[in-house]
């Protein structure tokens, strides 16, 4: 989907009153406020999320990406590139190919050269960003941060949207109904995002076919999390049938997830990295 088109559809739906203004959420006369104003200007109330990517070159493809029904994630010497299937009439089309890299390791000019060498695109935009999480996801017990106001993590795994949905669902079911406190809710969403961060970091641990400074750095970003280790151990304890949730005829517990991922997701990724990718790299 195109974020801009989706936003326009919601805003024009007529299901609620829309007022365009630049206000401080604390001044909004409402019981509860969802603050989705995007990335903050001041990061003093935020903490860094460990990740090897901090920049991206967005490109307009010279081929029809919509022919492929799934997104591509392509390893490069400087990081990785996403290719999102997008219709040429979509507002997102000019930015649907992105060369993700680390600007502290690779100069922008070098990254752009490598991008154009590997992909048939016109460079549309250069962006740099921080990976971060809010220290306090809930302000004054009534202002709920969400979207890029809550956190930002590089696009590998496209984890952001699901996190936003999970957070709203949790708030509606537990906080607004008085089943949980705002303090505990803040701890839970921060833990959830930490798990998302770790799962994304795991993607880099086996490296790629490129022996470069970026991949050396990316592989060095290890983490320690007992919950992650337990999920990985569980995923290795079942075959491809038993790993399915009980509701689908398997043996694992329904709703047992680390961040957004079940034991099945762990098993698929673990086997892909340790068996398929490692074998292919040995042949290079």
Give the predicted meaning of each segment.
Residues 3-120:
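Predominantly flavin-linked oxidoreductase catalytic cores and closely associated redox partners
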Residues 14, 29, 120, 152, ...:
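Short, flexible coil/linker elements and helix-boundary hinge sites characteristic
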Residues 2, 21-25, 151, 185, ...:
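Short, solvent-exposed coil/turn linker segments
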Residues 1, 32, 43-46, 70, ...:
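Sequence-level detector for tyrosine residue identity
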Residues 177-284:
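Long, low-complexity C-terminal extensions of enzymes
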Residues 87-89, 101-207:
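FAD/FMN-dependent oxidoreductases across multiple families
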Residues 6, 10, 32, 80, ...:
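Tryptophan-centric aromatic hotspots in well-structured domains and transmembrane helices
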């Amino acid at each position: 989907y195109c974020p801009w088109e989706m936003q326009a559809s919601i805003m024009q739906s007529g299901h609620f009153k829309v007022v365009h203004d630049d206000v401080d959420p604390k001044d909004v006369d409402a019981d509860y406020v969802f603050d989705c104003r995007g990335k903050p200007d001041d990061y003093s109330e935020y903490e860094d999320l460990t990740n090897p990517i901090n920049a991206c070159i967005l490109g307009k493809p010279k081929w029809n990406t919509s022919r492929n029904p799934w997104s591509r994630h392509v390893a490069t010497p400087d990081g990785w590139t996403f290719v999102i299937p997008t219709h040429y009439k979509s507002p997102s089309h000019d930015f649907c190919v992105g060369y993700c890299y680390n600007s502290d390791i690779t100069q922008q000019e070098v990254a752009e050269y490598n991008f154009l060498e590997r992909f048939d695109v016109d460079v549309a935009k250069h962006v740099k960003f921080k990976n971060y999480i809010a220290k306090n996801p809930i302000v004054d017990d009534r202002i709920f941060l969400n979207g890029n106001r809550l956190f930002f993590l590089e696009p590998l795994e496209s984890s952001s949207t699901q996190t936003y949905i999970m957070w709203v669902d949790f708030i509606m079911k537990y906080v607004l109904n008085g089943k949980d406190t705002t303090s505990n809710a803040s701890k839970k969403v921060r833990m959830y995002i930490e798990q998302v961060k770790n799962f994304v970091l795991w993607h880099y641990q086996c490296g790629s076919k490129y022996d470069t400074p970026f991949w050396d750095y990316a592989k060095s970003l290890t983490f320690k999390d007992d919950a992650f280790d337990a999920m990985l151990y569980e995923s290795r304890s079942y075959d491809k049938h038993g790993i399915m949730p009980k509701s689908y005829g398997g043996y694992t517990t329904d709703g047992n997830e680390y961040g957004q991922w079940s034991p099945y997701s762990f098993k698929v990724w673990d086997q892909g990295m340790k068996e398929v990718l490692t074998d292919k790299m040995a042949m290079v």
